């Protein structure tokens, strides 16, 4: 049985010349469970959190090294984006095509091509949710990840972890075309 979400990620990466290696494992919805399976995977493993702002019209994906702790209050201050809360499963599905426990930058392939050539939002896309660049999501990455040679994320499903080089992550983000920013996460 094939997993459509994982296959979609693999297809996108391969179509764009992004090298990757995927490791399959039981569902790992939390970092605590994942650490046991990640021991044999040579990469920097990441934690990925998805937040809407207090109005629900802006969405932020925050990616950082999995051993770090994140204070939402500190994040709110540093991002200057207002009050943040964890996204509901419905919002995750709508914006990233993901379910809780599977949040990943690879979900950004579902944050592409949201507007028509004339700039109007495609069907099912609310204009109020779009940033000026035509994407629903702004990405914040931990500055320390710039030093990682390899990084790993769930390929839109928590039954696998996909490893790519940092250079290929940057290529992926360029293909996505949305806004991202490097931030300090203690």
Predicted segments — roles?
Residues 1-186:
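Extended, low-hydrophobicity, polar/charged segments
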